[in-house]
Amino acid sequence: MVFEGHLVGTGLKVGVVVGRFNEFITSKLLGGALDGLKRHGVEEADIDVAWVPGAFEIPLIAKKMANSGKYDAVITLGTVIRGATTHYDYVCNEVAKGVASLSLQTDIPVIFGVLTTETIEQAIERAGTKAGNKGYESAVAAIEMAHLSKQWA
């Protein structure tokens, strides 16, 4: 037997957690995610968005959303751009681990849409220019995973 999630979001409730740091990028990721959700049938009234200060704060609010029982999936969006210190490495590692563990802890799909880039240019490319929009891609993944995970509910 083959299991697949379909890409029709009608009736799904989705939470989105967005890091405010590097907002000129994260706002474009959010725009892409909202566009992706709506284009696939998720009603605007069924989408909740929570802004947090930065990427490091994303896992806590994503966990609270996932544990609330209100959402079929949670999308996490943020942007971490390498600077001159090791801060980038710590933030990227902790955010990735935190978000990755949430699906296992909560049984709700939590999608990792946090950009971790070497340069501002790379982040811009992934927020709606030549490399697509990772927010949109995260929305599609959330819809697919919400349906797929319900097959074992």
Curated annotation (Swiss-Prot):
5-amino-6-(D-ribitylamino)uracil binds at F21, A55, F56, E57, T79, V80, I81, F112. GO terms for molecular function: 6,7-dimethyl-8-ribityllumazine synthase activity. Its EC number is 2.5.1.78. It catalyses: (2S)-2-hydroxy-3-oxobutyl phosphate + 5-amino-6-(D-ribitylamino)uracil = 6,7-dimethyl-8-(1-D-ribityl)lumazine + phosphate + 2 H2O + H(+). The active site is at H87 (proton donor). CDD domains: Lumazine_synthase-I. (2S)-2-hydroxy-3-oxobutyl phosphate binds at A84, T85, R126. GO terms for cellular component: cytosol; riboflavin synthase complex. This is 6,7-dimethyl-8-ribityllumazine synthase. It comes from Bacillus cereus (strain ATCC 10987 / NRS 248). The lineage of its organism: Bacteria, Bacillati, Bacillota, Bacilli, Bacillales.
